[in-house]
Amino acid sequence: MPKRDLPWRSMAGTSKVSRNANYSPRAGIGPRINKAAEWVNRPMYRKPRMYRTLRTTDVARGCEGPCKVQSFEQRHDISHIGKVMCISDVTRGNGITHRVGKRFCVKSVYILGKIWMDENIKLKNHTNSVMFWLVRDRRPYGTPMDIWTVFNMFDNEPSTATVKNDLRDRYQVMHKFYGKVTGGQYASNEQAIVKRFWKVNNHVVYNHQEAGKYENHTENALLLYMACTHASNPVYATLKIRIYFYDSITN
């Protein structure tokens, strides 16, 4: 028995509607991709030969795997006078967190945590910014210099810090960032998340000592300087700092 023609078949100018049509109001909402984005995110086989053959390797040049990691977890009391810590302290050994010999390359640095104020300070109406500097010390000696010795500041303000002219050859600022917290009874922002990941490719050299200390560095120590801009209200920073490094093949 043939099917009966439905009323919409006899109407002029109508077309059959698919059952799979999506009438959801969200159907037309989605990420718009233009030609520029498609070109930037094009697959590797559509790129020139130079991009396909000259890709950087995961292992740093002159090094060998596996990728090792060292973590520094600490709560810091950051004041206006600043603080410094060495993040290239790696003890000599055979573990996944140790260096095999004198030389290794820090491939990348990962900083994760937050800056926050205590109960008494967060009730005061003020804004405080915490400045961070990742510095490479090319010729480390003795103990790390404090922030006032390395940086030149106008009116004792850490936000205007630049490396002193006579120390520019030794200290090199690799990265710089800041986090801001605000105190008060109403529109307060008492804590701020800190999250940074950098590729540094820093080749560190130790002496014959096994302990991972700043005084045992001979070349390219990594230092993290911290200071807040408010003179009377300190800030706390709970940070986990991880360095990913490879041992040198010349050890």
Swiss-Prot record:
<comment type="function">
    <text>Encapsidates the viral DNA into characteristic twinned ('geminate') particles. Binds the genomic viral ssDNA and shuttles it into and out of the cell nucleus. The CP of bipartite geminiviruses is not required for cell-to-cell or systemic movement.</text>
</comment>
<keyword id="KW-1140">T=1 icosahedral capsid protein</keyword>
<keyword id="KW-0862">Zinc</keyword>
<dbReference type="InterPro" id="IPR000263">
    <property type="entry name" value="GV_A/BR1_coat"/>
</dbReference>
<protein>
    <recommendedName>
        <fullName>Capsid protein</fullName>
    </recommendedName>
</protein>
<dbReference type="GO" id="GO:0003677">
    <property type="term" value="F:DNA binding"/>
</dbReference>
<comment type="subunit">
    <text>Homomultimer. Binds to single-stranded and double-stranded viral DNA. Interacts (via nuclear localization signals) with host importin alpha-1a.</text>
</comment>
<keyword id="KW-0945">Host-virus interaction</keyword>
<keyword id="KW-1163">Viral penetration into host nucleus</keyword>
<feature type="short sequence motif" description="Bipartite nuclear localization signal">
    <location>
        <begin position="3"/>
        <end position="20"/>
    </location>
</feature>
<dbReference type="GO" id="GO:0008270">
    <property type="term" value="F:zinc ion binding"/>
</dbReference>
<feature type="zinc finger region">
    <location>
        <begin position="63"/>
        <end position="80"/>
    </location>
</feature>
<comment type="similarity">
    <text>Belongs to the geminiviridae capsid protein family.</text>
</comment>
<feature type="short sequence motif" description="Nuclear localization signal">
    <location>
        <begin position="35"/>
        <end position="49"/>
    </location>
</feature>
<keyword id="KW-1048">Host nucleus</keyword>
<feature type="short sequence motif" description="Nuclear export signal">
    <location>
        <begin position="96"/>
        <end position="117"/>
    </location>
</feature>
<keyword id="KW-0167">Capsid protein</keyword>
<dbReference type="InterPro" id="IPR000650">
    <property type="entry name" value="Gem_coat_AR1"/>
</dbReference>
<dbReference type="GO" id="GO:0005198">
    <property type="term" value="F:structural molecule activity"/>
</dbReference>
<keyword id="KW-0946">Virion</keyword>
<dbReference type="InterPro" id="IPR029053">
    <property type="entry name" value="Viral_coat"/>
</dbReference>
<dbReference type="GO" id="GO:0046718">
    <property type="term" value="P:symbiont entry into host cell"/>
</dbReference>
<dbReference type="Pfam" id="PF00844">
    <property type="entry name" value="Gemini_coat"/>
</dbReference>
<keyword id="KW-0863">Zinc-finger</keyword>
<feature type="short sequence motif" description="Bipartite nuclear localization signal">
    <location>
        <begin position="195"/>
        <end position="242"/>
    </location>
</feature>
<keyword id="KW-1160">Virus entry into host cell</keyword>
<dbReference type="GO" id="GO:0075732">
    <property type="term" value="P:viral penetration into host nucleus"/>
</dbReference>
<keyword id="KW-0238">DNA-binding</keyword>
<dbReference type="GO" id="GO:0042025">
    <property type="term" value="C:host cell nucleus"/>
</dbReference>
<dbReference type="GO" id="GO:0039615">
    <property type="term" value="C:T=1 icosahedral viral capsid"/>
</dbReference>
<dbReference type="GO" id="GO:0043657">
    <property type="term" value="C:host cell"/>
</dbReference>
<keyword id="KW-0479">Metal-binding</keyword>
